[in-house]
């Protein structure tokens, strides 16, 4: 008998900007990712202030889900998906972000997507803002640095809540909101890069602006949750964090303290606001050490307290080690920083693979918050090559996912309330961090390459059939 609950939400996850394409079709405006060029593991993608004719912008076509959604959702249904995590592209609904009236053609597209999901018995799990900030809001307001964006976000939320109230039950307010705790989050998450052109992960850091922007996102999230709970009691509202599990490198007390502070900053700062409705006890010292002063309106504290989430979701790909010692090798490709763990292997992109770390993380999060959890991103980005038979034999991906599902099962036995699992990039898509197609996660291979070529045909990998069996047995048969 499976340890996972009978209504466990098995599925997969994607983001609008990474797979929809059709970037300027049917009234859609440009979002921040539409201004990002392609890149690779060794060459950073750039954000530009205008579209350069000599550069390739992978989100413009991506894998063209916009015109392939029926085919793709049918493939998800063939695997047996119970849920599909996707996002709504803000600029399909409000091209600049500040309009009062929505773009009807954009709304109709998501009607079709959600209707197709329902036809196949798939429950949509919708991220309201998944790194898809309207670029016009960056140009005019410096993104979330301006409190004005709370009102624009609320208008967007009210529009999609009312439109899809009978089609979507599960909502996430922001994707990986704790990206705002890190310098790389300024482009994709907070959008606080007005006038900046350069490497997308290398914008000059301004902690004051970044953390003020994050506060505005917290208030916007809370307002959206309060509104949803008041008007649509059937909705379940969640948060989403990039969970950064780390370990102290040694038993040196300095390493232990450094790791504790890293966990506080990367995970609990945002998690506490979302789940407990207030900034954690350590926030004031953190602000002081960063030279930050958060401007808050008198009503913000009450808003945060009332606008707490119903469930907590997170991405989990890797772990890292933290040390105060200077003679230790860092981790390549790990956005959260840290140093190498000698006990772990790494992916082609240098991300250290740690299945037991997922069990550890689930226990840490559940022990702190005691609300239902969901792993909404997990997976192995790899260079997939077709065999002589024309099929991708991705046993390495199956091994990765199997080992992580095994540890999720152990966490459930530990007593963790786990409601679902949606591996990332269930169909190959554009990488958010590097802007490349070569970093493939999917159960479904898409014939699209980094130079923009490819006929966009879809083909099942070995992992497709394996995951279908996992879902059919509710996680019992992992062979």
Where do the protein language model's features map onto the residues?
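Catalytic domains of carbohydrate-active enzymes, especially glycoside hydrolases
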Residues: 64, 68-89, 123, 306-312
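A short acidic, glycine/proline-enriched capping/turn motif at secondary-structure boundaries
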Residues: 82, 91-93, 131-133
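Active-site region of glycoside hydrolase catalytic domains
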Residues: 1-53, 77, 96-98, 107-479
């Amino acid at each position: 008998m499976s340890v996972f609950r009978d209504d466990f939400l098995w599925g997969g996850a994607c983001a609008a900007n990474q797979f929809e394409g059709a970037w300027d079709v049917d009234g859609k405006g440009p979002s921040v990712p539409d201004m990002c060029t392609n890149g690779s593991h060794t060459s950073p993608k750039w954000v530009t202030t205008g579209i350069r004719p000599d550069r390739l912008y992978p989100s413009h076509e991506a894998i063209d889900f916009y015109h392939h959604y029926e085919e793709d959702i049918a493939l998800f249904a063939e695997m047996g998906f119970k849920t599909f995590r996707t996002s709504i592209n803000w600029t399909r609904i409000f091209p600049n972000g500040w309009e009062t009236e929505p773009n009807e053609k954009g709304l109709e597209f998501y009607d079709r997507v959600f209707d197709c999901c329902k036809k196949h018995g798939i429950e949509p799990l919708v991220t309201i803002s998944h790194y898809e900030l309207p670029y016009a809001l960056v140009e005019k307001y410096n993104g979330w640095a301006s409190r004005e964006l709370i009102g624009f976000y609320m208008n967007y939320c009210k529009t999609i809540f009312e439109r899809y109230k009978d089609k979507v039950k599960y909502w996430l307010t922001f994707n990986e909101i704790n990206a705002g705790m890190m310098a790389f989050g300024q482009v994709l998450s907070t959008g606080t890069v007005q006038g900046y052109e350069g490497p997308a992960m290398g914008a000059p850091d301004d902690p004051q602006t970044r953390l003020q922007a994050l506060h505005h996102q917290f208030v916007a999230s809370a307002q959206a949750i309060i509104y949803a709970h008041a008007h649509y009691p059937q909705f379940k509202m969640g948060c989403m964090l990039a969970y950064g599990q780390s370990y102290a490198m040694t038993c040196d007390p300095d390493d232990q303290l450094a790791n504790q502070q890293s966990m506080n900053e990367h995970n609990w700062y945002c998690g506490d606001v979302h789940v407990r409705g207030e900034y954690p006890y350590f926030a004031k010292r953190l602000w002081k050490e960063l030279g930050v002063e958060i401007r808050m309106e008198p009503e913000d504290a009450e808003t945060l307290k009332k606008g707490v989430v119903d469930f907590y979701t997170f991405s989990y790909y890797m772990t890292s080690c933290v040390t105060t010692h200077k003679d230790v090798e860092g981790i390549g490709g790990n956005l959260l920083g840290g140093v190498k763990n000698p006990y772990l292997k790494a992916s082609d992109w240098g991300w250290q693979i740690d299945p037991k770390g997922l069990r550890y993380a689930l226990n840490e999060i559940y022990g702190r918050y005691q609300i239902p959890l969901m792993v909404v991103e997990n997976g192995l980005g790899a260079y997939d090559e077709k065999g002589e038979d024309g099929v991708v034999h991705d046993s390495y991906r199956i091994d990765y996912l199997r080992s992580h599902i095994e540890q999720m099962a152990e966490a459930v036995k530990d007593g963790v309330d786990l409601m679902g699992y949606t591996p990332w990039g269930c169909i190959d898509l554009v990488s958010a961090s590097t802007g490349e197609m070569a970093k493939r996660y999917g159960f479904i291979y898409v014939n699209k390459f980094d130079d923009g070529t490819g006929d966009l045909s879809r083909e099942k990998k070995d992992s497709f059939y394996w995951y279908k069996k996992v879902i059919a047995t509710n996680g019992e048969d992992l062979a």
